[in-house]
Amino acid sequence: MMTKVGEVLLLLLLPAFVPHTDGTHYSLPGKPTEIKCRSPEKETFTCWWKPGSDGGLPTTYALYYRKEGSDVVHECPDYHTAGKNSCFFNKNNTLIWVSYNITVVATNALGKTYSDPQDIDVVYIVQPHPPEKLEVTVMKDQGWPFLRVSWEPPRKADTRSGWITLIYELRVKLEDEESEWENHAAGQQKMFNIFSLRSGGTYLIQVRCKPDHGFWSEWSSTSYVKVPEYLHREKSVWILVLVFSAFILLLLTWLIHMNSHSLKHCMLPPVPGPKIKGFDKQLLKSGKSDEVFSALVVSDFPPTTSNYEDLLVEYLEVYMPEQQELMVDKGKDHDGCLKSIGSASDSDSGRGSCDSDNLLMDKSGAPKEEQQQQNQEGDQIGKETQGPKEAWEKEAMPCANEDVVSPDASSEKVKTWPSVFSPVTPYSPLDPHNSLEMHKQHCLSNTQFPPGSPSSDHYIKEALQSSYWEVCFNNNQPYPQTEVHPQLQAHSDRNISAVNDRNAPTGLLLPTRMTEYVEVQRVNEENKVLLHPIPSGHSREKACPWVGQRDDYSKVKGVDSDNGLLLQREVVEEESMEMAGAAESCYTSSIAFTTPKQTACSPVALPVQDERVLAVSGYVDTATVFSVHT
């Protein structure tokens, strides 16, 4: 007890006497700092601290800890295993998932100094040791080298049992150059390959590791490796490639420089200047814009006073058929017609209506001369062959030059021969005889002329002088002429239609001079009524002596209000039948009725007994004969 009191007194008196003895100053030790604890494998851990000043006196350090949930303070179990200013906790003193409260105390002759307390958990303070046995090998893959790096985990890390799991990272850099490290994450594998190496370069390689929850370990020792030269054989190839590339680049540069002007014009074409006629650029530059614009503006535009009718242009459209469209085409209807002079047009195309009664084609020139020649030749032949019939032929020729058109036949087409016709004259109500001639068309029957016969022209001329005439009332055109008479037929086809059916009945009246009779001869095998005129009593025997005498004859009485032909029955003495063999010298004509069947001049007529109506007064009404079925 007395010793302890003496020690205390000594310590109290010592500071008072020490400064006076050697002139030094003493103080309490400094506070320990930077306390850290690390566990390399989660089984043991070590704590380090940094000591403070000792105060001029010998100072000792002690580590005290207290476990979580306990008030018992424990001192460090081992100050020597981990080195100076450290404390090592072995497996017996290490617990995981338990927090440790650690405090370091510095003590000297003047007193004690306590550090700040530090709480640690062994699980989160794990920092393993660096990997061991680092090896680097140069490998080749298809002639290209690469580095294969391998290592082993720290010896104290129990990675096999899974107590601790480590991940690795390595870094590589060239030795000759002061370049930065190139880091590569390797994961949990203990081998890694490095590609894209420089030929002949030396590389430095290091590896480190860390647990799932913890800190990276220190870098392992550096491993050096040199990559062999693997591009020495290709140096010449690369040199050649560079030379050729430079040559091509130089050539392209020279071509671009030589063609720079053309290229400039191609990519950047020049902007054309103003090309306005009368544009003065000097006036524009001087700022006199009014004068420039006044030179460009046209005076009196738009025109204030102008006869716009002068600007209109009238066009005259003339319809000219190709190669006489009136020529008959076999098996076809002919609708071509020319617009006659002085006739009104019924359409904007300039083509006259084919339904007008005045649209007859006016022949001139050679056709007229041909008509005159044919008429003269016909007269001569008629005089030589048919001399006894002169009186009757002269009276029959006006009828041969006329066309009988029914008022009901509005769509009838009559075939004519120009050799016996003159131009059609306009209708005049004062001249009924001329109006009748204007509206009639003569139609000769060519049934007796075989196609292509050389004497057809001669027969036609003789028939024109005959005392018989034939009228066609059908809707179909007669059979066309053969190729022997193409020119005659081309100039002779005329299409004539009645004017508005019944609008002009007076123009169709028969001549007022009722001196000519019509004899009903017979009905032939084609159902045609054969008639022949009887101008006088003595000429009738001369006209056709072979004709048999009948008990009844028909006299043209007139035309009734319905435009029907009225024939008067009359008894005449019979003539002898001795001249019956002379039938070849007479040419008969017939009034044909409308049927679908075609003949040489007109279709086969309907039965005559169905077309005639005998009136009570003794007249034969043939109005139905001339009415055409539409």
Swiss-Prot record:
- Lineage, broadest ranks: Eukaryota, Metazoa, Chordata, Craniata, Vertebrata
Q: Where, by residue number, does Zn(2+) bind?
A: D212, H213
PROSITE patterns recorded: FN3 (PS50853), HEMATOPO_REC_L_F1 (PS01352)
The record places the motif (Box 1 motif) at: 267-275
Q: Which GO terms describe its molecular function?
A: cytokine receptor activity; metal ion binding
Q: Show which residues sit on the Cytoplasmic side of the membrane.
A: 259-630
GO cellular component term, pick one: external side of plasma membrane
Gene this chain is encoded by: prlr
Give the CDD domains listed for this entry: FN3 (cd00063)
Taxonomically, which superkingdom? Eukaryota
From the record, which residues define motif WSXWS motif? Answer: 216-220
Native source species: Oreochromis niloticus (Nile tilapia)
- This chain belongs to the protein called Prolactin receptor
